């Protein structure tokens, strides 16, 4: 229909399942604007045992993000840095669908800044998370939302809202 192959949600789900198959803890994250008009974006968070944190990976834009020293950043860290006007660096070869080179100014400062108002993901990261077939229950979701905001009652409403960044981004090995 859009003459561009699969959308960002499907690409993120495929990458998520690849990470899971390789033994990495991973989840696909829907990045939402404050007011949903017709656009959001879905990327991945993959857990690094070495760095002890979730890392930003975007299969649609072949993108990852670092700080000014080259340290890989996670989605929560990028949100916080954008909010506080701290440096973020987009990988040099970031591009949309292997066609259009991306700039930090467009991808992070405009497009993703708009889509990072709140983030949501399934409570359980698993294969076929959103595949609909007889007898399968639709997954429960959790959202990280700003204080005073609720994702309930909105399209794709979640079961749980949290205002706690530490809880949302905690280690998958934490009990």
Where do the language-model regions lie?
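His-Asp-centered catalytic microenvironments across diverse enzyme cores
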Residues: 36-38, 47, 51-175
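Active-site neighborhood of thiol-dependent amide/isopeptide-bond enzymes
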Residues: 1-43
């Amino acid at each position: 229909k859009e003459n561009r192959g699969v959308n960002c949600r499907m690409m993120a789900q495929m990458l998520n399942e690849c990470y899971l198959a390789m033994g990495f803890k991973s989840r696909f994250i829907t990045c939402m604007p404050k007011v949903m008009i017709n656009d959001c974006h879905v990327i991945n968070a993959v857990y690094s045992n070495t760095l002890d944190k979730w890392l930003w990976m975007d299969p649609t834009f072949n993108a990852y993000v670092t700080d000014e020293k080259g340290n890989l950043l996670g989605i929560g860290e990028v949100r916080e840095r954008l909010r506080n006007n701290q440096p973020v660096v987009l990988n040099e070869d970031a591009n949309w669908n292997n066609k259009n080179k991306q700039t930090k100014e467009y991808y992070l400062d405009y497009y993703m800044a708009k889509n990072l108002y709140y983030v949501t993901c399934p409570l359980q990261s698993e294969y076929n998370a959103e595949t609909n077939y007889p007898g399968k229950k639709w997954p429960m979701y959790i959202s990280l939302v700003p204080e005073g905001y609720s994702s309930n009652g909105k399209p794709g409403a979640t079961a749980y809202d949290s205002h706690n960044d530490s809880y949302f981004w905690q280690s998958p090995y934490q009990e």
